[in-house]
Amino acid sequence: KWGVFIMLMGEFHHNLDEKGRLIIPSKFRNELGEKYVITKGLDKCLFVYSLSNFEKIVNKLSTLQFTRKNVRAFERSFIGSASLNEFDKQGRINITSPLVHYANITKECVIIGALERLEIWSLEDYNKYMKENEEDLASIAEDIFNMNYEA
């Protein structure tokens, strides 16, 4: 942990077993803590949050007007698919069938740290996404770091 801020970074490849379990590297487990929340992410991957970081998102969502169509749609997908879990003794997480289907996971997975969350991708979708976006990374970085960012 970096102060009060969780710092998840790195890329790992593991296989989903026949019971829907996936080994999460110990460096990620140590940052997330005993309990985690897994849910549908964006771009057809899964997001994994520490309980405290998920609570921050829920608190933010609770301030939004549920009468807005986009708010309801996001809550249904993001909150509706979320589940609170604990790592098993082997450091694995359980991924439910609906989440496996959503993320197109068959067996091979890529687990990446993305600051305050993990992303779990099917290997095929991750490679496709990275290939499609690699040429845009320079302009994306320029846009991000020109948004009132001071190092």
Please give the residue ranges for each predicted region:
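Flexible "stalk/tail and boundary" regions
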Residues: 1-14, 18-19, 27-85, 89, ...
